[in-house]
UniProtKB/Swiss-Prot annotation:
Belongs to the isocitrate and isopropylmalate dehydrogenases family. LeuB type 1 subfamily. This is 3-isopropylmalate dehydrogenase. The gene is leuB. NAD(+) binds at residues 281-293. GO terms for biological process: L-leucine biosynthetic process.
Length: 359
């Protein structure tokens, strides 16, 4: 069965890094992957061409696709747009909402070749391999009511932190399944000593636990989890948490690895349709210079093959190819050591392609 892949380069460095990832996708097709590749506009590119960050044709193509590969959205040229619903980032949020992408997978994996690039001592982070499972469509980012209004002569801003049982249960199942496939440890992060919504979160996680007797469930308050990620990160295997806490913790975990330019992500719905993107942003300050790191986007393709396209062997080939290139000493500027000459975006992509094809 032929699969459909939609590529959305987006803004900033997005077109440069997705170009390298598409090379790898085409190599996968040559290796037997039955898939068609289509390209579309999103974010600032959508605004410039159609006046909206998520054009109708892009959304229609995304709904028809098995997987979406996104580069990055946003840039200073669109920061003056006063209507927040017309900002580039709303294109990303619109895709998440319309595709019902409730589960976000953010690996924090330290490649041994890059251990010295971490901000922590090598002995603390060596062998680090964490998967953060973040609920993506509920919580305080989407809760109603919300707004800014006048009360008693002053402006008041308010938001609603809300989770329904079914939202917690479905992300919980994703996390338990992930822990079962990995090291068998799941840490649920909440703030159940203060927030009723996360008291319910903890109750639902506890209720699911007997269905997964091979997974050891623990709980941690989010403030302690942030501290433990820096103090002793290797205690974690899989972390599951809500939208806001996951947003913060996954970025903190990302920097344990030395470069956010190495880290992919996946956002899935219940049918395993997914959107795959690097964890980094559009980096407008280096856009067009050919120096961006494409590895996070290439590794996002590996996640796509594993979780949406049922091609885990090809995913492993990509991951091995990235390891080979790092073994060869090739580094883009963000992961280059002092005294080493960084390679270009294209050179890094070509090297991964060669290592992939050599297997």
């Amino acid at each position: 069965m032929s699969r459909k892949i939609l590529v959305l380069p987006g803004d900033g460095i997005g077109p440069e890094i997705t170009r390298e990832a598409v090379k790898i996708l085409n190599a996968c097709r040559e290796a037997g992957l039955e898939a068609s590749i289509e390209e579309g506009l999103v974010g600032g590119a959508g605004i410039d061409a159609h006046g909206v960050p998520l054009p109708d044709e892009t959304l229609a193509s995304a709904k028809a696709a098995d997987a979406v590969l996104l580069g990055a959205v946003g840039g200073p040229q669109w920061d003056k747009i006063e209507d927040l619903s017309k900002r580039p980032e709303k294109g990303l949020l619109g895709l998440r909402k319309n595709l019902n992408l409730f589960g976000n997978l953010r690996p924090a994996l330290l490649y041994p070749q890059l251990a010295s690039a971490s901000s922590l001592k090598p002995e603390i982070v060596a062998g680090l391999d964490i998967m953060i499972v973040r609920e993506l469509t509920g919580g305080i980012y989407f809760g109603q009511p919300r707004g800014i209004e006048e009360r008693d002569g002053e402006r008041v801003g308010y938001n609603t932190y809300i989770y329904a049982e079914h939202e917690i249960e479905r992300i919980g199942r994703v996390a338990f399944e992930m822990a079962r496939e990995r090291g068998g440890k799941l840490c649920s992060v909440d703030k159940a000593n203060v927030l009723e919504a996360t008291i319910l979160w903890r109750e639902v996680m506890e209720r699911l636990a007997p269905e997964y007797p091979d997974v050891a469930l623990s709980h941690m308050y989010v403030d302690n989890a942030a501290m433990q990620l820096v103090r002793a990160p290797k205690q974690f295997d899989v972390i599951v948490t809500g939208n806001m806490f996951g947003d913060i913790l996954s970025d903190a975990a990302a920097m344990l690895t030395g470069s956010i330019g190495m880290l992919p992500s996946a956002s899935l719905n219940e049918q395993r349709q997914g959107m795959y993107e690097p964890c980094h942003g559009s980096a407008p300050d280096i856009a067009g210079q050919g120096i961006a790191n494409p590895l996070a986007t290439i590794l996002s393709v590996a996640m796509m093959l594993r979780y949406s396209l049922e091609a885990p062997q090809l995913a492993e080939r990509i991951e091995r190819a990235v390891g080979t290139v790092l073994d060869q000493g090739l580094r883009t500027a963000d992961i280059a050591f002092e005294g080493t000459a960084p390679v270009s975006t294209q050179a890094m992509g070509d090297a991964v392609l060669a290592a992939f094809q050599a297997q």
